[in-house]
């Protein structure tokens, strides 16, 4: 994971106003892993793992792990495979602004998350010669499982 993290950010052009630190928080079912790196020069400066404990909320444990991050640190949440589903469907024939809404209904019977709690994004797939219509990969997760954590991170000025 750390090598992938470093490779990604080594390809990202440096911005004049870039934050001095970037971080990722991996959300696994039984532990959390925080990786913090300096942006210039790119260098991993901290890797910390926290085993999840009964009695404390998931959000509290995440916040305890990122508590020492300076305000405005860019944090990327990485979901483990059990926290999302990926499905492939035909791309709806609607304007781009309406694709997310249309996809919600296209995948509602293909995912375990209730429609009113569905958070999703999609990726266009390259067209194949034997395909009759354009396809998309849809990534779906539970909004309620992430909303409180994201709100708390925003209160702590973590981006």
Model-derived segments and their meaning:
Residues 1-159:
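Hydrophobic/aromatic-enriched cytosolic interaction surfaces used to assemble or bind macromolecules
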């Amino acid at each position: 994971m750390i090598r992938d993290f470093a490779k990604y950010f080594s390809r990202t052009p440096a911005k004049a106003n870039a934050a001095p630190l970037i971080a990722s928080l991996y959300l696994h079912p039984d532990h959390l892993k925080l990786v913090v790196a300096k942006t210039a020069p790119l260098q991993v400066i901290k890797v910390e793992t926290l085993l999840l404990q009964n009695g404390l909320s998931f959000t509290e444990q995440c916040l305890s792990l990122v508590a020492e991050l300076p305000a405005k640190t860019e944090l990327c949440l990485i979901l483990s495979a059990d926290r999302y589903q990926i499905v492939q469907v035909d791309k709806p024939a609607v304007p781009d602004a309406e694709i997310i809404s249309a996809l919600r209904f296209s995948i509602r019977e293909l995912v375990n998350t209730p429609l009113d709690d569905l958070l999703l994004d999609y990726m266009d797939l390259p067209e194949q010669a034997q395909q009759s219509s354009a396809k998309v990969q849809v990534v779906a997760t539970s909004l309620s499982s992430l909303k409180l954590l994201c709100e708390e991170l925003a209160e702590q000025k973590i981006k």
